[in-house]
Amino acid sequence: MERNVILAKNAGFCFGVKRAVDEAIKYQKEFGKKIYTLGPLIHNNDVVNYLEDNDIFAIELSDTNSLNKGDVVLIRSHGVKESVIKDLTDKGLIVKNATCPYVTNIQLKVKKCYEQGYKIIIVGDENHPEVIGINGWCNDSAIITNGKTELENIPAKVCVVSQTTEKKETWNKVLNEIVKESKEIVAFNTICSATDVRQKSVQELSKEADLVFVIGGKNSSNTTKLYEICKKECPKSYHIENVKELDESLLEDESVKTIGITAGASTPDWIINEVISKIKEL
């Protein structure tokens, strides 16, 4: 049966993630030994396995106590608290920073505004490593909200930033709440421009598609948000990590004429292409 397969614009690796992966591989070759990343370099199991095959391993912060002086630790694209970088350096470790420049920009804005007496509000997931890291640049004092519950006791003087992968509608909702309560507001819409374009693109795609596959790690924040957006417009939207999770029975439905494909920022092209090729085979 003839089907139309549409790949969303900006699907797959974003600038920050690609940069982090390239940096990790570059440093492994440069030092010629194991490279350690604080947490998985990106939220994609297939890519993590690929990196391990190239002597690049994810560890937790507590594991750095077991490393030797001169071992190489790479800060991933999500970034870390300011204090973490100092602690690693004090241990005699070689620290390489692959924090996404967009995240670094948020960290520096937060630090500056915090020092100027602003209460920091972060719109995002309090358990996400990017948000945890940003909070560390204001002495872990930020108010963190995902927009699902109303903010209470909002200070009069606030600085508002967002997780780079947050949904635009959540940002707008929280900002509207703050405007009603605070007298002095410095707001930086720090949603990554690529994230914004990606979300708008999948929203349009899911309106015209009969079936949508969102490809990316189940632990990937931005992929999950893309899936949520797709599901609103197209009930037949499915979040899969790779071609192995492609449910072929979904393609037996003769009413499915147009299939939309999108992918999170941690999904490499080869995983996307495998899914598209499989769909076209069936």
UniProtKB/Swiss-Prot annotation:
Gene Ontology terms, MF aspect: 4 iron, 4 sulfur cluster binding; 4-hydroxy-3-methylbut-2-enyl diphosphate reductase activity; metal ion binding
Record CDD domains: lytB_ispH
Catalytic activity: isopentenyl diphosphate + 2 oxidized [2Fe-2S]-[ferredoxin] + H2O = (2E)-4-hydroxy-3-methylbut-2-enyl diphosphate + 2 reduced [2Fe-2S]-[ferredoxin] + 2 H(+); dimethylallyl diphosphate + 2 oxidized [2Fe-2S]-[ferredoxin] + H2O = (2E)-4-hydroxy-3-methylbut-2-enyl diphosphate + 2 reduced [2Fe-2S]-[ferredoxin] + 2 H(+)
GO BP: any one term: terpenoid biosynthetic process
Record's keyword terms, sorted: 4Fe-4S, Iron, Iron-sulfur, Isoprene biosynthesis, Metal-binding, Oxidoreductase
EC nos: 1.17.7.4
UniProt pathway annotation: Isoprenoid biosynthesis; dimethylallyl diphosphate biosynthesis; dimethylallyl diphosphate from (2E)-4-hydroxy-3-methylbutenyl diphosphate: step 1/1; Isoprenoid biosynthesis; isopentenyl diphosphate biosynthesis via DXP pathway; isopentenyl diphosphate from 1-deoxy-D-xylulose 5-phosphate: step 6/6
Binding site for [4Fe-4S] cluster: C14, C100, C192
Co-factor(s): [4Fe-4S] cluster
UniProt: isopentenyl diphosphate binding residues: H43, H78, H128, S220, S221, N222, S266
One Pfam family recorded for the sequence: LYTB
Residues the record lists as binding dimethylallyl diphosphate: H43, H78, H128, S220, S221, N222, S266
Coiled-coil residue spans: none
Ion transport recorded as keyword: no
Chain residues that bind (2E)-4-hydroxy-3-methylbut-2-enyl diphosphate: H43, H78, H128, T164, S220, S221, N222, S266
Active site per the UniProt annotation: E130 (proton donor)
Keyword Metal-binding: yes
Binding note for cofactor: Binds 1 [4Fe-4S] cluster per subunit.
Function: Catalyzes the conversion of 1-hydroxy-2-methyl-2-(E)-butenyl 4-diphosphate (HMBPP) into a mixture of isopentenyl diphosphate (IPP) and dimethylallyl diphosphate (DMAPP). Acts in the terminal step of the DOXP/MEP pathway for isoprenoid precursor biosynthesis.
Protein name: 4-hydroxy-3-methylbut-2-enyl diphosphate reductase
Source species: Clostridium perfringens (strain SM101 / Type A)
Gene symbol of the encoding locus: ispH
